Amino acid sequence: MSIVALLIGLGPLIGWGFFPTVASKFGGKPVHQIIGATVGTLIFAIILAVVTSSGFPTGTNLLFALLSGAGWGFGQIITFKAFELIGSSRAMPVTTAFQLLGASLWGVFALGNWPGIGHKIIGFTALVVILIGARMTVWSERKEASNAKNLRRAVVLLLIGEFGYWLYSAAPQATSIDGLTAFLPQAMGMVIVAVIYGFMNMKSENPFRNKITWLQIISGFFFAFGALTYLISAQPNMNGLATGFILSQTSVVLATLTGIYFLKQHKTSKEMVITIIGLVLILVAASVTVFIK
């Protein structure tokens, strides 16, 4: 692995690692966050399309790319709602675990991954380890009923949001276009969902006139940067799909730690140790699910 490939492979660490923290730092409600983040992603995607002169898909390729982006928009709205309940540092490991489970199960039952009994035993064991790791990251020494209630609500929300993230990753597999070509229509699908959600919230306020909404465009740049560098990293002449995926998953570590330290989402020393162990379990188990394909 060259230095250039490694640096590009760590791009998602920066983009996706800081995205939830930046979005939470700017504040606002989920409606402000999703509109700003998706507009930022769309701006990034338009600039990329112009610079690279990548084509624009048509027909079913366009439809599935739009559905992919719409899925992400739905999933991210739900995730922002979970941030309100338990904070980004607790929500990110859980949603990452659910996304890994969703992608892995789709790969097994729809794409024929993990052939053979041995591979399936190892794979499903790794998925159990991922769930254990996620549970460890949200463990708390404080047993207040309100904390437990918020955690349960957040987990249910994140589980629902996983259907959107699953669509984000699965829909492009039904197309014949590459990631760079799909990037712009995906961003368009994200914005469509965000705008619809914005109009659904018009009774309480006009989110399109709130300055926080447009400040959140910066958070969208972080997400888009992570997505772009992942697409490049996964190319065979760079890190390849397996290594690129594993490097991208390190973003959950940065997202969790920056949430704790930058957003002051406090953890006790014991909680911190258990959280780090949980993150390591998630990363190791995620690596296993990739290499047994």
From Swiss-Prot:
Keywords: Cell membrane, Membrane, Sugar transport, Transmembrane, Transmembrane helix, Transport. It is a multi-pass membrane protein. One of its GO terms (cellular component) is plasma membrane. It is found in: Cell membrane. The keyword Transport applies. The keyword Transport applies. GO terms for molecular function: carbohydrate transmembrane transporter activity. It comes from the Bacteria. NCBIfam families: symport_RbsU. Could be involved in the uptake of ribose. Belongs to the GRP transporter (TC 2.A.7.5) family. This is Putative ribose uptake protein RbsU. It comes from Staphylococcus aureus (strain Mu50 / ATCC 700699). The gene is rbsU.
